[in-house]
Curated annotation (Swiss-Prot):
Organism: Buchnera aphidicola subsp. Baizongia pistaciae (strain Bp)
Assembly behavior: Component of the Sec protein translocase complex. Heterotrimer consisting of SecY, SecE and SecG subunits. The heterotrimers can form oligomers, although 1 heterotrimer is thought to be able to translocate proteins. Interacts with the ribosome. Interacts with SecDF, and other proteins may be involved. Interacts with SecA.
Keyword Transmembrane annotated: yes
Family under the similarity heading: Belongs to the SecY/SEC61-alpha family.
GO biological process, one term: protein targeting
GO CC terms of this entry: plasma membrane
Record localization: Cell membrane
SUPFAM superfamilies recorded: Preprotein translocase SecY subunit (SSF103491)
Membrane topology term: Multi-pass membrane protein
Phylogenetic lineage: Bacteria, Pseudomonadati, Pseudomonadota, Gammaproteobacteria, Enterobacterales
InterPro entries (UniProt xref): SecY (IPR026593), SecY/SEC61-alpha (IPR002208), SecY_CS (IPR030659), SecY_dom_sf (IPR023201)
Membrane-spanning residues: 25-45, 78-98, 126-146, 155-175, 184-204, 218-238, 275-295, 318-338, 376-396, 398-418
Protein name: Protein translocase subunit SecY
Length: 441
């Protein structure tokens, strides 16, 4: 009897989470496809020569893009552009939803408006991918040392390269949307996460090899590990931190009775902007070094070499520029992601209010005041997380994958993935309880 009950419970447990397993399998399958695609080269490029040449472009935006694409750029893969055009397109459309009347109306149309906005994101992604692939293909022969990388620099090569890069980016965008729909978590974030994590084993082995050869002291290696562990704990703590604003509801009269609803909370994350500010700030400080590595040997671009010298990680200008860019993008992207006035209007329409604060404009001002404080603290936290590993990487020659931006992305994506899995498990359990008790609505 006990054995049969146990078997029945195990069977029911397996049936409850069968869909979760299918979603997990779909994510794994999609990531395998992504990794396989990152090894498909663009026809007409000597991948061995390109990989050796990119070793001289360390500390530039090229290295960061190569990290996000899982090494696809160094292999001249069809996924070389990665998912960056989609990220840029999403931010452009988010800006338009704040300033353009047509996009403002679409945002208010609910599900139908969201589908139309997603279409515009796809169109702009296609345009950006076309521009970037054209620029990358045309500029390759003009970059010092890259002439020998292209086997036959003819018109047919440029056409094939441009089409391959555009197709690769559109495929990644489609794959990311499929992961979001049929898998677990945000598909685009998981693709970026997969690209970064794919380089961790080789970076770790390279660091261990330095310890074995004596170029990196064992104590320093242990110190680096402790710092990475502590920084990871800090990221987990901050990313889970929330400022909860107590929301009360007005009493309602139903028939001859008066009912008062329980109070709830409006949770505001300390770091609402996510990892986007770190990515764009890194792009800004690395962009001059990228241009200088391409055109610095020409006479009319010599001034770029001087700028790059002052934008080295130990220089005050680098630190100031990096911190300023992070703070700016934190406030900018938080303003795009969260609208205090819209939140205040929704609270007023639902009969909710904050104790001691008048509904409407006063509530919006109160929420905005809290958001400004949280965003400032969040930007300081992000600047610290991004700068400390970067300085360690410069002074201690730690591999690029241990940088602050990559660490932040890895931890944030894992936290979001675990949260969504937990939410899915809870919703499945609630559904099973309702079915068991035959509740109907």
């Amino acid at each position: 009897m006990i054995k049969k009950k146990l078997e029945t419970k195990l069977k029911n447990f397996g049936n409850q989470f069968s869909e979760l397993k299918q979603r997990m399998y779909f994510v794994i399958f999609s990531l395998i496809v992504f990794r396989m695609g990152s090894y498909i080269p663009i026809p007409g490029i000597d991948t061995v020569a390109l990989a050796s040449l990119l070793e001289h472009h360390r500390g530039t935006i090229i290295e960061m893009f190569n990290m996000f694409s899982g090494g696809a750029l160094s292999r001249a893969s069809i996924f070389a552009l990665g998912i960056m055009p989609f990220i840029s397109s999403s931010i452009i459309v988010q800006i338009l939803t704040l300033i353009h009347p047509k996009f403002i109306e679409m945002k208010k149309d609910g599900e139908q408006g969201r589908h139309r906005i997603n279409k515009y994101i796809r169109y702009i992604t296609l345009i950006l991918a076309a521009l970037q692939s054209f620029g990358m293909s045309i500029s390759l022969p003009n970059i010092p040392g890259l002439k020998d990388v292209i086997i036959d620099p003819s018109i047919s090569f440029y056409g094939i390269a441009i089409i391959s890069l555009i197709t690769g980016t559109i495929f990644l965008m489609w794959l990311g949307e499929l992961i979001t729909e049929k898998g677990i978590g945000n598909g685009i974030s998981i693709i970026i996460f997969s690209g970064i994590v794919s380089g961790l084993p080789s970076s770790f082995l390279n660091t261990v090899e330095k310890v074995r050869q004596g170029s990196l002291h064992v104590l320093l290696f242990c110190f680096i590990g402790i710092v990475i562990f502590l920084v990871t704990l800090l990221v987990v703590y901050i990313e889970r931190s929330q400022r909860k604003i107590t929301i009360s509801y007005a009493k309602r009269n139903l028939g001859h009775r008066t009912y008062s609803m329980n109070s709830t909370h409006l949770p505001l994350k300390l770091n609402m902007s996510g990892v986007i500010p770190a990515i764009f700030a890194s792009s800004i400080v690395l962009f001059p070094a990228t241009i200088a590595s391409w055109f610095g040997n020409r006479d009319h671009f010599k001034w770029l070499v001087d700028i790059v010298f002052y934008l080295q990680p130990t220089k005050p200008l680098y630190i100031l520029t990096y911190i300023t860019a992070i703070i700016f993008f934190c406030f900018f992207y938080t303003g795009l992601a969260f609208n205090p006035r819209e939140t205040a209007d929704n609270l007023k329409k639902s009969g909710a209010f904050i104790l001691g604060i008048r509904p409407g404009e006063k509530t919006a001002q109160y929420i905005n005041k809290i958001m400004l404080r949280l965003t400032f603290l969040g930007s300081m936290y992000m600047a610290f997380i991004c700068l400390v590993p970067e300085l360690m990487r410069f002074f201690m020659d730690v591999p690029f994958y241990f940088g602050g931006t990559s660490l932040l992305i890895i931890v944030v994506v894992i936290i979001d993935f675990i949260s969504q899995v937990q939410t899915y498990i809870m919703s499945t359990q609630y559904e099973s309880v309702l079915k068991k008790n035959k509740f109907r609505f």
